[in-house]
Every structure is written in C-alpha cells, then in structure tokens.
UniProtKB/Swiss-Prot annotation:
<protein>
    <recommendedName>
        <fullName>Serine/threonine-protein kinase BUR1</fullName>
        <ecNumber>2.7.11.22</ecNumber>
        <ecNumber>2.7.11.23</ecNumber>
    </recommendedName>
</protein>
<feature type="active site" description="Proton acceptor">
    <location>
        <position position="195"/>
    </location>
</feature>
<dbReference type="GO" id="GO:0004693">
    <property type="term" value="F:cyclin-dependent protein serine/threonine kinase activity"/>
</dbReference>
<dbReference type="InterPro" id="IPR011009">
    <property type="entry name" value="Kinase-like_dom_sf"/>
</dbReference>
<feature type="modified residue" description="Phosphothreonine">
    <location>
        <position position="405"/>
    </location>
</feature>
<feature type="compositionally biased region" description="Polar residues">
    <location>
        <begin position="614"/>
        <end position="625"/>
    </location>
</feature>
<dbReference type="InterPro" id="IPR000719">
    <property type="entry name" value="Prot_kinase_dom"/>
</dbReference>
<keyword id="KW-0418">Kinase</keyword>
<comment type="similarity">
    <text>Belongs to the protein kinase superfamily. CMGC Ser/Thr protein kinase family. CDC2/CDKX subfamily.</text>
</comment>
<keyword id="KW-0808">Transferase</keyword>
<dbReference type="GO" id="GO:0005524">
    <property type="term" value="F:ATP binding"/>
</dbReference>
<dbReference type="GO" id="GO:0006351">
    <property type="term" value="P:DNA-templated transcription"/>
</dbReference>
<keyword id="KW-0723">Serine/threonine-protein kinase</keyword>
<dbReference type="GO" id="GO:0000307">
    <property type="term" value="C:cyclin-dependent protein kinase holoenzyme complex"/>
</dbReference>
<dbReference type="GO" id="GO:0005634">
    <property type="term" value="C:nucleus"/>
</dbReference>
<keyword id="KW-0539">Nucleus</keyword>
<dbReference type="InterPro" id="IPR050108">
    <property type="entry name" value="CDK"/>
</dbReference>
Amino acid sequence: MSDNGSPAVLPKTEFNKYKIGKVKSTPAIQRDAKTNLTYIKLRKRSSEKVYGCTVFQNHYREDEKLGQGTFGEVYKGIHLETQRQVAMKKIIVSVEKDLFPITAQREITILKRLNHKNIIKLIEMVYDHSPDITNAASSNLHKSFYMILPYMVADLSGVLHNPRINLEMCDIKNMMLQILEGLNYIHCAKFMHRDIKTANILIDHNGVLKLADFGLARLYYGCPPNLKYPGGAGSGAKYTSVVVTRWYRAPELVLGDKQYTTAVDIWGVGCVFAEFFEKKPILQGKTDIDQGHVIFKLLGTPTEEDWAVARYLPGAELTTTNYKPTLRERFGKYLSETGLDFLGQLLALDPYKRLTAMSAKHHPWFKEDPLPSEKITLPTEESHEADIKRYKEEMHQSLSQRVPTAPRGHIVEKGESPVVKNLGAIPRGPKKDDASFLPPSKNVLAKPPPSKIRELHQNPRPYHVNSGYAKTAIPPPAAPAGVNRYGPNNSSRNNRFSGNSTAPNNSRNPVNRFHPETNVSSKYNKVPLPLGPQSRYQGNSNESRYKNSPNDSRYHNPRYVNKPETNFNRQPQKYSRQESNAPINKNYNPSNGSRNMAGDHHQGSRPSHPQFPISPSQGQHQLTSKPIEKKNGSFKDERAKPDESKEFQNSDIADLY
C-alpha cells in the first residue's frame, strides 16, 4: 500500500504477462494498528455454494410429503425452471454429531456409479440454509441436504394394495424380469442392495420398474456372481447381519451369519414374487426369533442335507424345531409346477443352492404360457406406500355400505332389489318351556315308562308348543245331579242354543254340559268328564282357536251361525289329525250334533293328544249318538264312564312332573 493510502499497484512481471483471464478486483490490504500487521480483508459472497450441489432457493419447491424412513423423508417437489415433478429425499443430519450420515454417503456414491434403466437415477444434490462462514464448528448445523430423484407415479407396495389394480400373470412375469435385470446389474458391479422389498421398487408412467433406496447397499468382496454361485462366495469377508427389513430377511441373516453373499437379495426377490399373489408380505414375524419360526413353518426345518452349515451358526437352536414345508399347499392354487419350482429355488434355505439373478432370468417359468407382456399399462391413479392406509379405509367403508345379498334360495330378477320380500306373519318360535329345551326329568312330552301310560286315563296337564300348559290338570268339581243353578223356569237361558238332540237346550244345566250343543262347564257338576273331541279338558285348550269352520272358533258367536256370507279368516290347525295315518273311528258321527273339533277322532289315541295313546283295556271314551234320558225327574248319563279303579293319583302326577 502506498503512503497516500491508495492500493498498491503490482509491478508487471513475466507471470502477469501470461496470466489468463482478467482480474476482477484487487484485494485490499489493511494494517492492524495494534499489531502493525497487514492482512487482506475477505468479503462474504452473496450465496455460499457447496461443491457439487445446487442451492435450494429459487430452484425447487416442496409440495406434499410422500413418506418417511429411518434415514430420511421423501417429498414431492417441482423444479421451478422446467416445472417438472421430482422426488426430493431429505437427508437427516444429526445435530449432536454434526456429521453427514454414512448411509447417505454410500447411497450417493453408489448411485453416481450406476447407470441402468432399472436403477433409479440421481439427478443432483441440493442444500439450503447456508451457515455463517465464521462459525466453522457448525458447518452442517441447520443445513438440509436433498437428493433429487425422478418422480415415480407408483411403487410396487402401493400397486399390490390398490384394490382397483389387478395384475395378470403376464404382467407379473414382466415385472419379475425387470427386477432381475436391475439386480443382476448391481451384483455384477460388485454391490449388494441389502434392502429388497416392494416399497423400494418404483414404477414410472411407462411401466418401467426401478430399484431404489440404496441406503443399506455396500461394496462386497470376492468374485462377482455367475450362473451357479452368488457374488462374494468364499471370500470370508464379514459384514453386519442387522440389515434388510425383517419380513424380507434371509434365513442366514436370521441365524446370525456375517459371511453372507449377494444371495440375501435373491431371498428378498422371492418374497416379493410370492407377495404378488397374496397382496401382503408372506413372512410377517413379530420378533427376530419369531421370524425364524415363520420361515421354517413355510419351508420346513432344514436338515443336514438341506443346509449343512445351519447348525454352526449363532442361532442354530432354531434348527431344532420340527416343521413340515407348506409352500406347495399355500401357493399351489396360484402357480403351476414350474412356477412352484421357481419360487422354491428363490426361497431355498441354503444360500448356495439359491438361484442367482443371472440364472433366474433363464428359468423355464418365463418361457411357458402366458409369456411376459411387452409393456405394463397401469392406471393413471398414483399408488404409493403412503396410500395403503387410505385404501384400507375405502375398503372398510365400501363393505359397510354394501347392499345385503339375497337369502339362500331366492333368485333376484333383473331390476329387482335384492331384499327379502314380505312373507307375512312369521310363526312364533318355541317358548322357553318347550319340550326340546327341557331336561328328560322335567319334559312332559317325553315318553314315560309303559306302566305309567297304562295307569293314566286322563291327560296329564296337556301342553302345546304355542300356548304352553293348560291351566289345570284335574277337572274342577261339578254340581250335584239335578241341581240347576239358574232355576228350572229360566227359559231365557234354556233357549239360547238350538240343536238336533232331544235333550233340553239348557246351556247352563250341569247335566247337559256334555251335550254336543253345549260346551259350558259348571263347578257343581261332579259327573266325570268324558274323553272325546267335545271335551273341554282334552288336548290343548287353544286347539279350538284355528279350525276349519266358524263353529270351531273359540270366539264363536251363535248369532252368526246361520249367515254363510260371514267370513271367518281362521287358519287351519297346523297339526291336524286328518294328516295322521291313524285309523278313523267309524263310530264317531259328526252329523249327530257333534262338532268336528280337530279333525276326525282317531282310533287308538286320545282325542287331540297323540302323545298318550289309550290302551284297549281303558276303553275308548268317545261321544256316541245315544241321547240322554230323563229318569226320576233328572237327567242321567248312560254313556260309558271311565274305570273308577284307574283314578288319577297325586303320586302319578308327582312322578310325571
């Protein structure tokens, strides 16, 4: 610097004569007054750049978030200059260590060296929030780095879970060939992917599959793979065994083997291939130990011939199980014999018996019908792993709003709503006291011993399915003979009914209670009740409700007997005696003033109660056409009476109930 303070002019030298370019500005040299030292003052640039990276501002814009992983987050972005959609993978920088992640370094390095149509392409690196250059200790603090990748419309996980996408076998073969092509290129470049799964297989708008997410990939030692042996076989190099997502982890990794090869990627391809058919991961272990059990349940416990090295691995105790292989039973409905052989060789327990990517491309399964398609056509809808939750919610909502299907046996015509038609009144179900719900000790309808049947001459508290038990088991006492509780001159009550019988028409006369035209009982009548279709206490008390004629109705009004136009909509008795095969009693004459209560009277069984037949020794207590004669000023019933020696005892009732 000159004395007047103007910048010093550099003298012309031989070097300046050959200098290329033009010096934009001469640095200003300043002197410190305290130390008397000269120094050059540096000016801060408008934008601090990182070598090989592009600044984020004014170049890219973030849109929606596509997903999040262990080592970063993925966003959908737009390149502002070209307005093209890109995928931006944000790299998480640890604040404590202030170091660039080793996984990101490996991924960037490997992607820069790979160039294949089935491998994702790294466009460039982007950063934002430039730090203060005076703070050298925090060069990466508050700085975000992005990996700019081409935007893919779908990944294989979202495609398989999308209910609106159905892949044919020809499309599956096309996808498998593309996966094997990309994986073979990686292995031949002496890299292991170590994280093959459906979420890391991307699909572009042209149906081209691309392997992505090389965060766990690394260089392996040894020879590259060939048609027989995997890459790195026999090298003796050790790697970490905590790699690959658990559900896609090879059995040698589960057992703790550290000297693994590129065969761990082939196992993941086999899991992806089986997932095409079940639409979900096929080996979903809950823990690392449980993952081994799940694998051996599908492929069987390895024997000495299947996998000789397994018993020398750290997790060899899992090989002591005794599981049978179920691969054929599980996937036999989806694949042919050739397809099962292809899947079995991809999922071989011994890594040295597993197919390589180079040999798998030439398997006979790809040459049988149907042949692989030339191009995969996917719908315009985007399908990513982040959309799986939405697919499940839509599926649950559609199932809850689905119209109920038609019942079995009902044919839905065209244009008809698949609902059950109105079938009218449905019969009532059995009551809780039904015989089918009672134990044998309390079941009245259960057949008692034969001795009990012969001793009974009356119905023991009749029971019906719809109405239950009768109100009483023993008839009430009747009035003495000849006693008229309404008086002998009560003609208004005596002329209420008319019939063909010669007996008086006194409906309240206790003597006439058994007349065919009178069915009114009296508590003063001690005359034993006969058995027959006219007995009030025989069978079910509700059997008279639904008869074939209006006179058989319980609510019968005699005023409308002679009016044929009256419509009595009564349903016929369900268990009619007319449907029975029992012989009809020819002595019974319904035209003699007796009403047909529940069909014709059957011989050999009690009226309206077929469960308790009457033995011939007890007699057939039936109504006959013999009229009642009046003797000594009173009516006397000359009809057959039950044997007094066969009275119904209380002990019998107790035994029965």
